[in-house]
Amino acid sequence: MSKVSPTETERCIESLLAVFQRYAGREGDNLKLSKKEFRTFMNTELASFTKNQKDPAVVDRMMKRLDINSDGQLDFQEFLNLIGGIAVACHDALLVQPPHP
C-alpha cells in the first residue's frame, strides 16, 4: 500500500508544530513559550519584524497581549493567535496592492 504524501497545508501545520516545539521548553514547560523563549523565537523566526521596530519593548507588549490566560507564557493556542494575526495582516496587505498591468 502506498503512503499518501502530506498536502501543502499539512506540511505547513507540521512546520508550525515543529517551530513551536523547537523554542518551547528550553526553560521548563515544553508545552509553553516563556517570555525569553518567545523573544528568542521572535528574534530568530520573525527577525525582519523585530529588527524594524523602533521600540525595543514591542515584543514584550506583544507577549502580554497574546497571553490570554495571563500566566506569563504562551501555549500553542496563544502562539497560533500570533501566527494567524500575521497571516491576516499579510493577506490584507496583498489586497491593497494595485493590480499588475
UniProtKB/Swiss-Prot annotation:
Gene3D superfamilies: EF-hand. GO terms for molecular function: calcium ion binding; calcium-dependent protein binding; S100 protein binding. Ca(2+) 2 binds at D67, N69, D71, Q73, E78. GO terms for cellular component: cytoplasm. InterPro entries: EF-hand-dom_pair, EF_Hand_1_Ca_BS, EF_hand_dom, S100/CaBP7/8-like_CS, S100_Ca-bd_sub, S100A11. SUPFAM superfamilies: EF-hand. Transmembrane segments: none annotated. Smooth muscle and non-muscle tissues. Ca(2+) 1 binds at N30, K32, E37. Residues 13-48, 54-89 form the EF-hand domain. Homodimer; disulfide-linked. This is Protein S100-A11. It comes from Gallus gallus.
